[in-house]
Amino acid sequence: MEGEVTIKDTTAGSPAAVGFYGLGFAATFAGLLNMGMFSDATMVIAMAITLGGLAEVLAGIQLFKKGDTFGATAFTIFGFWWLAFSYINLAPAGLFNAPMAAASAPSMAYFTLMWGIIATLLTIATLKIGVKMITVVFIVLDLTFFSLALVFFGVLPLGIAGLITLVTGLCSLYLANALVMSSVGIKVPF
């Protein structure tokens, strides 16, 4: 019939696992770098752009389509955080334009402090989701941002913030794996 629209079933899996894998890999390697396990930041920046940034933003966009405002917002803004953080670290090298001055420690302290506040507000919302591991991931993410702020304020050693970031990454990887396992009927506590 003319003017008739057919809607196909768009049921799909949750993109949240991809977002948590993105956070997990990027945070794990950033944590290891900050703990002094290696000194080459190239791989960490690549992880931050591709997995931390793009994977989380794409997961967020897909969650917007599913009507999941919390998941969409969290993955999208934190994905853009990884992209912004990468730009801040690459801009002084002149990769995108003429070399720029490196961000000052105080500016980075306030940058990470603001993200810690936003993460904490989102953590409150996780209490209503009903998945305890999501709350755990957000709590350690809060601690990651606040510990990085303290590093940039000059009151906390970078290695401690690195350890907290590593824990964030590992918790996020566990959650991502649990979501995937659960989707195929394997029970994993989360």
Descriptions of predicted regions:
Residues 110-121, 132-152, 157-178:
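Alpha-helical membrane segments in multi-pass integral membrane proteins
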Residues 62-70, 124-136:
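Membrane-helix interface "capping/anchor" motifs
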Residues 58-65, 84-98, 121-125:
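Membrane-helix exit/interface motif
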Residues 40-53, 100-115, 136-138, 163-166:
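Structural signature of hydrophobic alpha-helical transmembrane segments
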Residues 187-190:
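Short, highly charged, low-complexity non-transmembrane loops/tails of multi-pass membrane proteins
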Residues 34-41, 91-106, 152-159:
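Helix-coil boundary and interhelical linker segments in multi-pass alpha-helical membrane proteins
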Residues 1-63, 69:
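N-terminal topogenic module of multi-pass integral membrane proteins
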Residues 72, 76, 80-110:
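Helix-adjacent hinge/juxtasegments
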